[in-house]
Amino acid sequence: MPKLKTSKAIAKRFKVSSSGKFLRHKASKSHLLQKKSSKQRRHLSSTCSVDLKDIKNIAMQLPYL
């Protein structure tokens, strides 16, 4: 049986926590930041966990994480 390939695009965007959850960065933090409040920018910089509906698809593309 051949080796499974890891999707490099997915591997760059998601990390696995020590408890096994997938973590992601929030969107809307790359540009047009001047109109956003500092509170909004601060909350966008934190990580959050992936929704339960998306975990199966991400786990299939990251077989060795």
Swiss-Prot record:
It comes from Pyropia yezoensis. One of its GO terms (molecular function) is structural constituent of ribosome. NCBIfam families: rpmI_bact (TIGR00001). InterPro entries: Ribosomal_bL35, Ribosomal_bL35-like, Ribosomal_bL35_CS, Ribosomal_bL35_sf. It comes from the Eukaryota. Gene3D superfamilies: 4.10.410.60. Residues 25-44 have a biased composition (Basic residues). Its main location: plastid. The keyword Cell wall biogenesis/degradation does not apply. This is Large ribosomal subunit protein bL35c. GO terms for biological process: translation. The keyword Ribosomal protein applies. Keywords: Chloroplast, Plastid, Ribonucleoprotein, Ribosomal protein. Residues 25-45 are annotated as: Disordered. One of its GO terms (cellular component) is chloroplast. It is found in: Plastid, Chloroplast. SUPFAM superfamilies: L35p-like. Belongs to the bacterial ribosomal protein bL35 family.
